[in-house]
């Protein structure tokens, strides 16, 4: 995993150049937005169990056959696995948001996820819907538009962070498609 600083340094080192210009400005912006980034991650972490359970519940409410016999999350064991997997995905999205880099999400969470779910017979549509609900909920927390928040989110415009986290969820959706 390379954070924003490591990426810039690695790039400059590869060119045998000093860090400067646009790279330095990008790092200055990353640092100045740091408190918003940390507060946004804190909002996700503080509300993680609600985000995960509401996302999975929303998926089940929209498709009740999933909890019927032979459904994708029929047994307690399958439901627990579904909740666990959603929590893991949310955790890696929060790591990516904190570092400003999606490589940890891609390398440690998404690599082989689709194949694993396919081999277990997990329905792809349910996964996609859970991720979609989770994305909307997290963006609501970051932009301070959620009714359920336990903590306040940062003041000011967080639309760039909301867009960034939306991109991480889009990577998850693409990996599962």
Curated annotation (Swiss-Prot):
Compartmental location: Plastid, Chloroplast thylakoid membrane
Annotated 15,16-dihydrobiliverdin binding sites: 50, 54, 61, 129, 148-149
Cellular-component GO terms for this entry: chloroplast thylakoid membrane; phycobilisome
Modification(s) after translation: Contains three phycoerythrobilin chromophores and one 15,16-dihydrobiliverdin chromophore with binding of the phycoerythrobilin chromophores mediated by both the alpha and beta subunits.
Pfam families for the chain: Phycobilisome (PF00502)
Residues binding (2R,3E)-phycoerythrobilin 3, per UniProt: 82, 84-85
The keyword ATP-binding is assigned to this record: no
Membrane disposition: Peripheral membrane protein
Broad class of where this protein is predominantly found: plastid
Binding site for (2R,3E)-phycoerythrobilin 2: 28, 35, 39, 144, 154, 156, 158
Top-level taxonomic group: Eukaryota
Keywords noted in UniProt: Bile pigment, Chloroplast, Chromophore, Electron transport, Membrane, Photosynthesis, Plastid, Thylakoid, Transport
GO biological processes: photosynthesis
Binding site for (2R,3E)-phycoerythrobilin 1: 18
InterPro entries hit by this protein: Globin-like_sf (IPR009050), Phycobilisome_asu/bsu (IPR012128), Phycobilisome_asu/bsu_sf (IPR038719)
Family, as annotated: Belongs to the phycobiliprotein family.
Miscellaneous: The light-harvesting system in Cryptophytes contains phycobiliprotein complexes. Unusually they are composed of either phycoerythrin (CPE) or phycocyanin (CPC) but never allophycocyanin (APC), with only one type of biliprotein being present in any one species. Unlike cyanobacteria or red algae these proteins are not arranged into higher-order phycobilisome complexes, and they are found in the thylakoid lumen.
Record note on quaternary structure: Heterotetramer of 2 different alpha chains and 2 identical beta chains which form 2 alpha-beta heterodimers within the heterotetramer. The two alpha-beta heterodimers are rotated to an open configuration in contrast to the closed configuration found in other cryptophyte species due to the insertion of a single amino acid, 'Asp-65', in a conserved region of the alpha chain. In the open form, the central chromophores are not in physical contact but are separated by a water-filled channel.
Function, in words: Light-harvesting photosynthetic bile pigment-protein from the phycobiliprotein complex.
Name by which UniProt lists this protein: Phycoerythrin beta subunit
